[in-house]
Structures are given as C-alpha cells and as structure tokens.
Swiss-Prot record:
The keyword RNA-binding does not apply. Binds 1 Fe cation per subunit. NCBIfam families: PRK02260.1-2 (NF002602). It comes from the Bacteria. Gene3D superfamilies: S-ribosylhomocysteinase (LuxS) (3.30.1360.80). GO terms for molecular function: iron ion binding; S-ribosylhomocysteine lyase activity. Transmembrane segments: none annotated. Belongs to the LuxS family. It comes from Haemophilus influenzae (strain PittEE). PANTHER family: S-RIBOSYLHOMOCYSTEINE LYASE (PTHR35799:SF1). It is an enzyme of class 4 (lyase). This is S-ribosylhomocysteine lyase. Involved in the synthesis of autoinducer 2 (AI-2) which is secreted by bacteria and is used to communicate both the cell density and the metabolic potential of the environment. The regulation of gene expression in response to changes in cell density is called quorum sensing. Catalyzes the transformation of S-ribosylhomocysteine (RHC) to homocysteine (HC) and 4,5-dihydroxy-2,3-pentadione (DPD).
Length: 167
C-alpha cells in the first residue's frame, strides 16, 4: 500500500490553528488543484468533538465557498479529518495561505452568527446521515477558539518526517 502524503509530515511539529498546502497537482487539461490541511487542533493534544465537527462540516463548507470562491478559485470539497483535528479542503486554483486564512477566519465569524440549530443547512433525515449528531454550541466553541488563537501557517519543509520514522 502506498504511503499517503498526509502521513509523511511530522504531526508532533504541527501548529494549530494553521493552514498547510498539503498537495498540488495539475489535471491533464491544465487545471491546478490544491489540497489544503486546515488544522484546527494540535495533533495528539486536542480534538474536535464529534457533534461539533459534524455541525461545523455543514456550516464551514458553505461559508468557505462564500469567502474564497471566485474567478480563479472553486472549492471542490471540504471534509473532516478522521483524526478530528481539522479538515481537508480541495479546490481548483492556487490561493495562498493568507487568502485561505482570511476566508477561514471570516467563516468562523459566520459560524458564530448562526443562532439556532434549525439554521444549520441540510440538517434533516433526508440530507444528513447522522442528523441527530449535531451541536451548534460545540461549533461555536470551535469557532471562538480559532478566532482567539489566530491562524498560522504550517510549511511542509518544516514538518518533513525523517525516513527512519516512516512505517
């Protein structure tokens, strides 16, 4: 089984909240695709609650599109990490970390503006596979934490995992 790029970085050196360009690629038609690691929590020290990350998934995807999509950028997908320390965002285009950071902060402000559970998009039995597993309160706490701490940048060259540690 090939070793995925996300496991070639040293998680003990990651800062959070922080943006990292996890991968870039070019399609055969010439489109640039960028995958971002949006790290909300310090790996192995902090974790997002299951209900909080789920609610954030419903809110964050739309808010990030509102703030980042444009003529040269289109978000393909934003998905929570299985380790519950952040999200991966795949998009067409090549925004820099600062642009992504600004959109992320604005999105966290938008999350705080959601006043009740009924305002969470797609929160129903038909559009959500676990529609009872949500917490707007937890999502608000996550957003407040990101805003209070600010968003940094994790660079791949600073996180390169020594080959002796690869398994």
């Amino acid at each position: 089984m090939p070793l995925l790029d996300s496991f070639k970085v040293d998680h003990t050196k990651m800062n959070a909240p922080a943006v990292r360009i996890a991968k870039t690629m070019r399609t055969p038609k010439g489109d640039n695709i960028t995958v971002f690691d949006l790290r909300f929590c310090i790996p192995n020290k902090e974790i997002l609650s299951p209900k909080g990350i789920h609610t954030l998934e419903h809110l964050f995807a739309g808010f990030m599109r509102d703030h980042l999509n444009g003529d040269s950028i289109e978000i393909i997908d934003i998905s929570p990490m299985g380790c519950r320390t952040g999200f991966y965002m795949s998009l067409i285009g090549t925004p820099n970390e600062q642009e992504v950071s600004e959109a992320w902060l604005a999105s966290m402000q938008d999350v705080l503006g959601v006043q009740d559970q009924a305002s969470i998009p797609e929160l129903n039995i038909y559009q959500c596979g676990s529609y009872t597993e949500h917490s707007l309160e937890d999502a608000h706490e996550i957003a407040k934490n990101v805003i209070a701490r600010g968003i940094g940048v994790n660079k791949n060259e600073d996180l390169s995992l020594d080959n002796s540690l690869l398994k």
